Curated annotation (Swiss-Prot):
Domain of life: Eukaryota
Subunit annotation: Part of the 30S ribosomal subunit.
Swiss-Prot/TrEMBL keywords: Chloroplast, Plastid, Ribonucleoprotein, Ribosomal protein, RNA-binding, rRNA-binding
Name used for this protein in its record: Small ribosomal subunit protein uS11c
Gene Ontology molecular function: rRNA binding; structural constituent of ribosome
Family note: Belongs to the universal ribosomal protein uS11 family.
Record GO cellular component, one term: ribosome
Ranges of compositional bias, category Basic residues: 9-22
Origin organism lineage: Eukaryota, Viridiplantae, Streptophyta, Embryophyta, Tracheophyta
Subcellular location: Plastid, Chloroplast
GO terms under biological process: translation
Alphabetized Pfam families for the sequence: Ribosomal_S11
Chain positions covered by the region annotation Disordered: 1-22
């Protein structure tokens, strides 16, 4: 029978709160991806490292309610609340997708008190690339 390896120190670390809470981020980029089924809001620093994120699904909305403007507004508010506490004052906004939550998420970002340097639509548009899926017959 092998001998157990002795543990040095305790199993729990002495850290209280999250590891990323210590960073001060004065400027960031807010990415909003609004599809017809869900809205995902990701906040990164200027180098592209994710600081905070939220989606309509993680906010408790299920099924078709995830694609609603109110769900997008709630997701944007949740993602931004944490970075405002970390000291973010200025942000750029990149909006992608055709979903219903585009305007609602942008409205929630504007109301958060962040100074927006610009808002850019980065929805990918094909230059006659792949063939689209066939139309639904209901």
């Amino acid at each position: 029978m092998t001998k157990p390896i002795p543990r040095i120190g305790s199993r729990r670390s002495g850290r209280i709160g999250s590891r990323k809470a210590g960073r001060r981020i004065p400027k960031g980029v807010i990415h909003v991806q609004a599809s017809f089924n869900n809205t995902i809001v990701t906040v990164t620093d200027v180098r592209g490292r994710v600081v905070s994120w939220s989606s309509a699904g993680t906010c408790g909305f299920k099924g078709t309610r995830r694609g609603t403007p109110f769900a997008a507004q709630t997701a944007a508010g949740n993602a931004i609340r944490t970075v405002v506490d970390q000291g973010m004052q200025r942000a750029e906004v990149m909006i992608k997708g055709p979903g219903l939550g585009r305007d609602a998420a942008l409205r929630a970002i504007r109301r958060s008190g962040l100074l927006l340097s610009f808002v850019r639509d980065v929805t990918p548009m094909p230059h006659n690339g792949c063939r689209p899926p066939k139309k639904r017959r209901v």
